[in-house]
Design a protein with these regions (language model features):
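Positively charged n-region of N-terminal signal peptides that target proteins for export
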Residues: 1-5
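Generic hydrophobic-segment detector
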Residues: 6-8, 23-24, 57, 75, ...
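Bacterial N-terminal signal peptides
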Residues: 7-16
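Alpha-helix termination/capping residues and helix-transition junctions
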Residues: 13, 24-25
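Sec/Tat signal peptide C-region and signal peptidase I cleavage site
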Residues: 17-21
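Beta-sheet ligand-binding and adhesion/scaffold domains
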Residues: 25-56, 84-137
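N-terminal glycine/threonine-rich, aromatic-flanked beta-hairpin/loop signature
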Residues: 43-82
Length: 137
């Protein structure tokens, strides 16, 4: 009986270790995709074939990351800004702060696909949903 108990305890330790040791996703690199948005004073918009959006994860140390994004809506000047964020304990949830304004919450759908929801409050409030795919080198 003691032997069975010892094996059961040993098996539980190994299983618990495997569960806790989930690998942190590597987000480094460039991602592109589409967006739909609503901006106060402008209304609804989305990415067209003449626009572009590139999100680049430049640095990542464990669950903390930083990078920059460039976007060019159709018939508008190109813009860019930096961001930093963290991956949640579930290794699926993303939290960003964009350096000029706003916050982004996201979900890692797969190694090569993420969805982001951007929120900015105040006088020029806006919301956007982005579906991004990793650009393969």
């Amino acid at each position: 009986m003691k032997t069975i108990w010892c094996f059961a305890m040993l098996a539980m330790v190994f299983l618990a270790t495997g569960i806790c040791a989930a690998e942190v996703p590597n987000l480094l690199g460039k991602w592109t995709g589409s967006w739909s948005a609503y901006d106060e004073g402008i209304g609804y918009s989305n990415l067209t074939e003449n626009g572009s959006f590139i999100l680049t994860f430049v640095e990542q140390e464990d669950r903390i990351f930083a990078g920059n994004m460039t976007f060019k809506p159709e018939n508008e000047a190109e813009g860019g800004k930096g961001f930093a964020g963290a991956i949640g304990l579930d290794n699926k949830t993303l939290y960003f702060v964009e350096f000029d304004k706003g916050y982004t919450l996201g979900t890692i759908i797969s190694n090569d696909e993420i969805e982001l929801i951007y929120l900015a409050d105040g006088e020029n409030g806006s919301v956007a949903i982005d579906r991004l795919y990793r650009i393969k080198a």
